[in-house]
Amino acid sequence: MRITGGVHRSRELRAPKGQKTRPTADRVREGLFSMLASRRPLDGARVLDLFAGTGALGLEALSRGASHGVFVESDRAALLALRENVRALGFEAASVVIAQRAERVVEALKGPFDVVLCDPPYALVREPELAALLSKVAAHCHAEATIVLEHDAKDPPPSILGAIVTFTRRYGDTGLTFYEVSALLKPPAND
């Protein structure tokens, strides 16, 4: 697994052994960031990487010009790899790693975010809790922010209060759904 673009292009990333963490494939990440770049520049963006795992998505965003990344992950082995990857790429000053379950920290997130990258366990996409979680996340985003959800291509993406689906792309068994946060639909943040 490697960074596919930006200042750290081709740099290898650490990943925990085993099947518990499912890093986003390089070609899927390349496609995701190509589509993201066609919609909005990443330069200076504040990025939230939910269910961060190794941090591959958020670190890719930082490599491509984002100014700040918040990584939320609860698995101990993934956190070790994530922290090592942040350190190896020199992104300590631009990164905040939160060792907690996403559901527990969403209310306390310090936004606003321009881009949210969400790669939850695929089974969670079918649960109403994910839609509720992403609706809360939308409240911590700028209007017109982009939320990207990675999911099993067979599963329909959930509806998110405060955001509209703009499109879904399929990469083999992987689906990427892009949402745009709408100022008209956005729920208020709990400050």
What is each model feature region?
Residues 1-191:
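Class I S-adenosyl-L-methionine-dependent methyltransferase catalytic core
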